Amino acid sequence: MKYIVALDQGTTSSRAILFDESQNIIGVAQKEFTQIYPNEGWVEHDPMEIWSSQSGVLSEVIARAGISQHDIIALGITNQRETTIVWDKNTGKPVYNAIVWQCRRTAKICDELKEIEGFSDYVKDNTGLLVDAYFSGTKIKWILDNVEGARERAEKGELLFGTVDTWLIWKLTNGKIHATDYTNASRTMLYNIKELKWDEKILETLNIPKSMLPEVKDSSGTFGYANLGGKGGHRIPIAGVAGDQQSALFGQACFEEGESKNTYGTGCFLLMNTGEKFVKSNNGLITTIAIGLNGKVQYALEGSVFVGGASVQWLRDELKLISDSKDTEYFARKVKDSAGVYVVPAFVGLGAPYWDMYARGAILGLTRGANKNHIIRATLESIAYQTKDVLKAMEEDSGIKLNGLKVDGGAAANNFLMEFQADILGESVKRPTVLETTALGAAYLAGLAVGFWENKNEIKQKWVLDKEFTPNMPKEERDKKYAGWLKAVERTKKWEE
């Protein structure tokens, strides 16, 4: 038997997942690592700990499955996106901790960049992104400006930059390969996703030497070889690389224009494949590269909901209405509807398509008969409403009709939520049997490159449906409920002065 290993380097843990040809999961190994918070709003990881945890679980998953390294035909990598590492090209030592995507330390740099006439528009038109602390560009600038000697060393060509995928490729190949894929490059705010090259104008504005940047390659193809077991060990091709959300889109076999996926985690991440069209959003969504294959790219629109599953944690930990998040389905089904109650979980403001940082959460429409079941049900419904908000914006921006929604992530296991999602969208919602779609995407990309799977058609056929939820709600009722949601959202806006 031959296998593929997907390395899934996430924000809180590193995982390795072993797949066979039929996409069965043969083994999983996982190790959490340290979150570092040096100041308020700052988040860092130790790059050496990212590497040791990731290489550790790789060895562990092979040993536990009782197979030989020679049975592994390829490695795929998927990773937390935007997180930024700068290291010395000769010693391989990081000059600073990894600055994580969540870190807000460069917000001030972003404010200054926004003052430059036309710069924000230029970034949006060419990288598809917003000028924001979330993306890698300003994080690199911060390291060069604040770490002693970093700028001089970078200008001499001694330092390299990479997102987490690039760092892992560098370490796996013993410093031979400095490369990334199209999807990860598209999250740096430095990559021109129309011309498919590093953008000189942005590099100049941020004062980042081009010599630091990795080579950008197809998401599926040989990046280099991982030497497991040192000299004379088995060399395994690193053959697939994609950022986590794009990898999940691929793992859901969303290969056609209009196909979309939602990952229901703490927040929700929605991506819609827009094919070969670069679609500029007028609704606060970002445009990104969905995947790069054979020197060509497909684009996607991306929108995120800040509070998805986190609202269920709030019911459990703060309101103490439930003891386990799985109980929400039982309570939601005890009432026939939410009795006009709406929960708007704008705890940290509202994300796409509203972008109101000053909105705050609210429970609206309460009457004397409203009870805990209505509030629990309305909280689950809020996740579906917010998903609809983003998908509606995607349809408006792209002019592409939504072609069903594929779902994954923790809350996708909640049947009540999935039924309501289908009802409120008026579209089918498809849940796969393999919910590890992020890792599966990386495995697919690697497998295609080495001929483990022949082509995308074979993958599409192997994608197995667990359950399809179809809409049963009359249009009139759907429109009325959604209008109530929009009214509730209006009430929460600009609450904080």
Curated annotation (Swiss-Prot):
ADP binds at T11, R15, T266, G309, G410, N414. PROSITE patterns: FGGY_KINASES_1 (PS00933), FGGY_KINASES_2 (PS00445). GO terms for molecular function: ATP binding; glycerol kinase activity. Sn-glycerol 3-phosphate binds at T11, R81, E82, Y134, D244. Keywords: ATP-binding, Glycerol metabolism, Kinase, Nucleotide-binding, Transferase. It comes from the Bacteria. Transmembrane segments: none annotated. Gene3D superfamilies: 3.30.420.40. It is an enzyme of class 2 (transferase). Its EC number is 2.7.1.30. One of its GO terms (biological process) is glycerol-3-phosphate metabolic process. Pathway: Polyol metabolism; glycerol degradation via glycerol kinase pathway; sn-glycerol 3-phosphate from glycerol: step 1/1. GO terms for cellular component: cytosol. Key enzyme in the regulation of glycerol uptake and metabolism. Catalyzes the phosphorylation of glycerol to yield sn-glycerol 3-phosphate. Belongs to the FGGY kinase family. NCBIfam families: glycerol_kin (TIGR01311), PRK00047.1 (NF000756). HAMAP family: Glycerol_kin. This is Glycerol kinase. It comes from Fusobacterium nucleatum subsp. nucleatum (strain ATCC 25586 / DSM 15643 / BCRC 10681 / CIP 101130 / JCM 8532 / KCTC 2640 / LMG 13131 / VPI 4355). The lineage of its organism: Bacteria, Fusobacteriati, Fusobacteriota, Fusobacteriia, Fusobacteriales.
